[in-house]
Amino acid sequence: MGIKNKFFLNDSLLIDISTGDITLQGLGEYQEKLKMDERLPKIRKILSITRDANVKFSLKEMFLYVEILKKTTSDTNIRWAILTSTPSVTAFASLIELDKLFQNKVLICSTLETATRFLQIQITESDLQSSDFKQF
């Protein structure tokens, strides 16, 4: 599993890009490191790029993770676009999107254009290829 991210503080935006097999343990470790970043409270928009990723945990673990995410999400005044093209990630993202806490705040997208429109940001494919993303 590979995750890299970049903060765009002028836009109150965090972009994270996941590749390979996403495990519950790997996702939890990433979240723990992310929570320690002092820039996180300034973020109001999240773009998660998961086009090249696959969820490698059970449905029960997916539900468990959503519950953990709800408990650790102190600020629900965010907008989160999840850009995906794989069935496993789409199913996982759907559990988040359908939860009452995240209703109207999370959108599953199949194109970057849809995601940027939902978040009201200007990001291009070339921005996602930048070498200054931090690898986790």
Question: Whereabouts are the PLM-identified features?
Answer:
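Amphipathic, Lys/Arg-enriched alpha-helical "gate/interface" segment within cytosolic domains
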Residues: 1-136
